């Protein structure tokens, strides 16, 4: 795929929203401002098939031919997120339903269900016609499947979903006896004696379902979305030229994005809206990372696809007329946020959208241009970003210079979605590790653990955190043991290993399958009550916060106690241990990796401030390293409305201005510097 071999800029464009007289001037203005790709079509089903079976592609033929003649590249979206009125009215079984089983009505988007045979038939027909008609068009470089799979809702509760769920379960368990055992249906007399008795989780008397059913249901939702995506991809590839790529945009919940990226798509793309970190009615909080927090999501995206694209990069104020209110990017923020994406691995950045829509639900979801279509500050910033992107082309294809990894599995991701005990600690640790890494300028990767993950993939990282592997499998345990035996450091947190893959709690002490490696047994555990003071421990003479959840650990012979509680009813009990395994070691922390705790781990494990000899910077700026063929680059990003001072330890080349810099350097408000090191 040639598309990401150079960094480039794009924009989302809706030719169906505008008079054709604007098309040519719009495209020329885009090109004049450094925009070379447009995404189109993802909501335009009714333009292509106004009545059932009546396909008319002449509208987009004219636009695509104009793109070809002007030199504009096109990413064409399949418009399956917005079925036309004739379809949903004639075939109501294609609609999704709410928890009470009531069908959604026409008039929004993403109101269909993935499992309706009729919907899949209509989608397959349309996508096939599109691919056959445009699969060799010279302007098209790629295709986007649907739009934002699992956005708006990731619950699918229609009759078609219920039927498909039962088929999914029959394939997985083969017999009701196996299902009843895995789900523990003996509890509350939930035992099933006929497959037809099982349904997707509709409203019940207690607003609570069997957690093992819910875990399998979330897996089913993901499998349904992936099947829907794969169906379209397979159809496209029958007709499109090999030079064209297939992608989709995300990232949303109850979806195995890693599986989709690796086995269905050519490249993964993300929609980045940093200003949603602000609440319009909130006051500024210095401890909050605000728009800088988007780097957490970009780090997740990088685990899905190391070299990804941004399909929708925020360019203006955001919101629907009835919900969501995000303010206009201040001068400099538009380019800052785009560079934030590039710093974390994006080699393509497409802004949403070219011109703000004067009609419809998204009249406040501003584009680069306002309703009046005049040149403005935001367009000038887009042009400046495009020019700056050319100055750093040498960074294209570089990996992120991650100093440690945070392990994740899809089972634990889905379990944390349905289990509040798991979800609370998981979210707290992910947020805490991210904040600590930001404050200590320590880039990290999320590392997805799969059945086919190879040991060398883990050995890239001297330290791996597995914060809360509630669900732990034997093959995962074996891989982690091999990693440690070869010299790696594994750090685990509380609530590790107390469930199997079905969500059942095996009758064995925590940390379950890792007990042999940790040499510990969990004796006591509890959430911290809001009425209680936060527990503390002491590690290497410094305080270690134990917040949110507390465990006391019983060490075996050969396991060293590194920290004990100094407060709470667990005072004196071990909370942090270390055990040597082969050439490596395992640290077991009986708590959550809050910001303070995670920062203490990064410092004590020698991970914090990896670039401090080159760049000394306040924790108010972000530093991200990228590396390729032995060459490294540092992105220094200032998210604040005032300049920040950094100190360069040696002479470095600033790529954006071509100057050499050393000593004290000022990073202006809402600005970025890129250094070759």
Language model: regions and residue ranges:
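Short, acidic/polar
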Residues: 18-32, 123-129, 251-261, 330-338, ...
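An acidic-aromatic substrate-binding cleft motif
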Residues: 1-22, 29-36, 283
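Short, well-ordered coil/turn segments that N-cap beta-strands
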Residues: 5-9, 34-36, 68-74, 136-141, ...
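Carbohydrate-binding surfaces of carbohydrate-active enzymes
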Residues: 195-198, 230, 242-243, 273-276, ...
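The substrate-binding groove and active-site-proximal loops of carbohydrate-active enzymes
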Residues: 9-18, 43-58, 105-124, 149-153, ...
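Polysaccharide-binding and catalytic clefts of secreted carbohydrate-active enzymes
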Residues: 101-292, 296
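Aromatic-lined substrate-binding rim segments of carbohydrate-active enzymes
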Residues: 24-31, 39-103, 232-240
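Conserved, mostly hydrophobic/aromatic
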Residues: 11, 30, 38, 67, ...
């Amino acid at each position: 795929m040639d598309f990401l071999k150079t960094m480039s800029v794009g924009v989302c464009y809706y030719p169906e929203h505008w008079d054709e007289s604007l098309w040519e001037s719009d495209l020329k203005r885009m090109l004049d401002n450094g925009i070379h790709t447009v995404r189109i079509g993802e909501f335009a089903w009714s333009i292509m098939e106004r009545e059932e079976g009546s396909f008319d592609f002449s509208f987009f033929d004219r636009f695509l031919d104009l793109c070809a003649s002007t030199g504009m590249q096109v990413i064409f979206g399949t418009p399956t997120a917005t079925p036309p009125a004739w379809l949903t009215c004639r075939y109501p079984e294609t609609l999704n339903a709410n928890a009470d089983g009531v069908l959604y009505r026409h008039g929004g988007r993403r109101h269909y269900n993935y499992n309706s045979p009729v919907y899949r038939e209509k989608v397959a027909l349309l996508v096939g016609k599109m691919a056959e008609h445009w699969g060799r068009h010279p302007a098209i470089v790629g295709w986007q499947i649907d739009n934002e799979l699992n956005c708006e809702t990731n619950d699918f509760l229609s009759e078609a979903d219920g039927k498909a769920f039962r088929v999914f379960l029959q394939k997985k368990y083969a017999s009701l006896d196996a299902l009843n055992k895995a789900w523990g249906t003996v509890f509350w007399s939930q035992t099933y004696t006929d497959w037809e008795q099982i349904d997707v989780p509709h409203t019940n008397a207690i607003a609570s379902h069997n957690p093992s059913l819910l875990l399998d249901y979330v897996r089913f939702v993901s499998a349904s979305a992936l099947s829907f995506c794969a169906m379209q991809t397979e159809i496209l590839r029958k007709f499109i030229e090999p030079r064209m790529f297939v992608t989709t945009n995300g990232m949303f919940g109850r979806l195995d994005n890693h599986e989709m990226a690796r086995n269905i798509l050519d490249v993964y793309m993300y929609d980045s809206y940093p200003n949603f970190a602000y609440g319009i009615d909130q006051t500024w909080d210095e401890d909050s990372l605000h728009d800088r927090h988007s780097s957490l999501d970009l780090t997740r995206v990088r685990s899905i696809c190391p070299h990804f694209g941004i399909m929708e990069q925020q360019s203006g104020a955001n919101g629907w007329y009835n919900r969501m209110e995000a303010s206009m990017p201040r001068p400099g923020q538009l380019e800052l946020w785009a560079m934030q994406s590039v710093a974390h691995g994006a080699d393509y950045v497409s802004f949403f959208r070219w011109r703000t829509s004067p009609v419809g639900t998204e009249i406040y979801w501003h584009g680069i241009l306002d309703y009046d279509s005049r040149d403005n500050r935001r367009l000038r910033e887009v042009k400046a970003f495009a020019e700056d992107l050319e100055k750093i082309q040498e960074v294209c294809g570089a990996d992120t210079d991650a100093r440690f990894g945070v392990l994740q599995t899809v089972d634990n991701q889905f379990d944390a979605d349905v289990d509040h005990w798991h979800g609370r600690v998981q979210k707290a640790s992910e947020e805490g590790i991210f904040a600590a890494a930001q404050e200590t300028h320590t880039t990290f990767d999320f590392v997805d653990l799969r059945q086919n993950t190879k040991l060398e993939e883990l050995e890239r990282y001297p330290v791996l955190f597995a914060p809360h592997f509630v669900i732990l499998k034997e093959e995962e345990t074996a891989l982690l043991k091999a990693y440690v035996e070869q010299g790696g450091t594994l750090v685990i947190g509380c609530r590790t290993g107390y469930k199997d893959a079905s969500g059942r709690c095996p009758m064995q002490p925590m940390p379950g399958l890792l007990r042999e490696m940790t040499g510990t047994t969990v004796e006591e555990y509890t959430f911290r009550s809001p009425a209680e003071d936060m527990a503390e421990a002491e590690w290497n003479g410094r305080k270690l916060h134990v917040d949110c959840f507390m465990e006391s650990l019983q060490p075996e012979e050969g396991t060293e106690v590194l920290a004990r509680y100094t407060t709470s009813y667990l005072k004196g009990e071990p909370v942090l241990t270390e055990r040597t395994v082969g050439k490596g070691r395992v640290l077991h922390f009986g708590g959550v990796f809050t910001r303070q705790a995670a920062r203490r781990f990064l410092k004590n494990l020698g991970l914090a401030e990896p670039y401090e000899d080159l760049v000394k910077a306040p924790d108010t700026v972000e530093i991200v390293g990228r590396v390729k063929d032995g060459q490294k680059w540092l992105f220094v990003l200032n998210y604040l409305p005032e300049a920040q001072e950094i100190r360069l330890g040696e002479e470095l080349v600033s790529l954006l201005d071509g100057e050499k810099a050393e000593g004290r350097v000022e990073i202006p408000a809402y600005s970025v510097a890129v250094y070759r090191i």
